[in-house]
Curated annotation (Swiss-Prot):
Its cofactor is Mg(2+). Mg(2+) binds at D29, E216. It is an enzyme of class 2 (transferase). GO terms for cellular component: cytosol. Homodimer. GO terms for molecular function: ditrans,polycis-undecaprenyl-diphosphate synthase [(2E,6E)-farnesyl-diphosphate specific] activity; magnesium ion binding. This is Ditrans,polycis-undecaprenyl-diphosphate synthase ((2E,6E)-farnesyl-diphosphate specific). The keyword Magnesium applies. It comes from Buchnera aphidicola subsp. Baizongia pistaciae (strain Bp). Its EC number is 2.5.1.31. One of its GO terms (biological process) is cell wall organization. Substrate binds at residues 30-34, 42, 46, 74-76, 78, 80, 197, 203-205.
Length: 251
């Protein structure tokens, strides 16, 4: 199934304003609650969440977003049951294995951000292969945050900066906010415009701590498997209606 399928159904319904975000980041929350409401296992919820992610990618393509960042697996999620973690890793591998053709077909570049060393060898190799196969794609950049935390990302950036100083490739006095951004996995050349969190919780869960200083935040009670194109449209409409001041006085 292609990402574009059924998107044309929304062509005459969607009526966006000009203020469209370039970079949208989504905290995909609510798979377990969604499954529980239906008397299903959490695993069923995660698999349904995978299809919600495909819809989000389709929406991003159709509306020409430049970057879509999906928070798939927090470093704190290792505290879940071994069985659930096993299912999540298998689902991740399944998605990578089955979506590569679509990624290339629609000119999508995949980038997995996070500490990949904790993944098993098979999954690490699959990530490496898919990233390489989509590296030259110039359309949507799809970031998948897996085994990721914002604090970890900043810590890794600090370590790299220290090494650069020791190697005399960087001067301590030359370090600016822009320098730090350059060492992050997601830099601010295209800043995060909008952060969406599904599932009814109003927190950021250690996601993109550095990058979202000026991002607009949108929280919805909609559970992730139910987050369809209409729900995505609501978030974009809300973003379009907001005045982004960046510290300036309101007009």
């Amino acid at each position: 199934m292609s990402y574009s399928k059924n998107n044309m159904l929304f062509k005459n319904v969607l009526n966006f304003k000009k203020n469209i975000p370039s970079h949208v980041a989504i905290i995909m929350d609510g798979n377990g609650k969604w499954a529980r409401k239906r008397g299903k296992s959490r695993f069923f919820g995660h698999f349904s969440g995978f299809y919600a992610a495909r819809r989000a990618i389709s929406f991003a393509l159709f509306h020409k977003l430049k970057i879509l960042t999906l928070y798939a697996f927090s470093s704190d999620n290792w505290n879940r049951s071994p069985r659930e973690i096993k299912v999540l890793m298998e689902l991740f591998f399944y998605a990578l294995s089955n979506e590569t053709n679509n990624l290339n077909k629609y000119n999508i570049r995949l980038k997995v951000i996070g500490n990949k060393e904790k993944f098993n060898t098979v999954l690490k190799n699959k990530i490496r292969v898919v990233e390489k196969e989509t590296l030259k794609n110039t359309g949507l950049l799809l970031n998948i945050a897996a085994n990721y935390s914002g604090r970890w990302e900043i810590l890794e950036a600090i370590k790299k900066i220290v090494v650069a100083i020791k190697c005399k490739n960087l001067s301590l006095n030359a370090i600016t906010e822009s320098t730090v951004s350059d060492f992050l996995l997601i830099n601010e050349k295209i800043p995060v415009d909008l952060v969406i969190r599904t599932g009814g919780e109003c927190r950021l869960s250690n996601f993109l701590v550095w990058q979202i200083s000026y991002s607009e935040l949108y929280f919805t009670n909609t559970l992730w498997p139910d987050f369809d194109r209409k729900e995505f449209k609501k978030a974009i409409d809300e973003f379009s209606n907001r005045e982004r001041r960046f510290g300036r006085v309101s007009h």
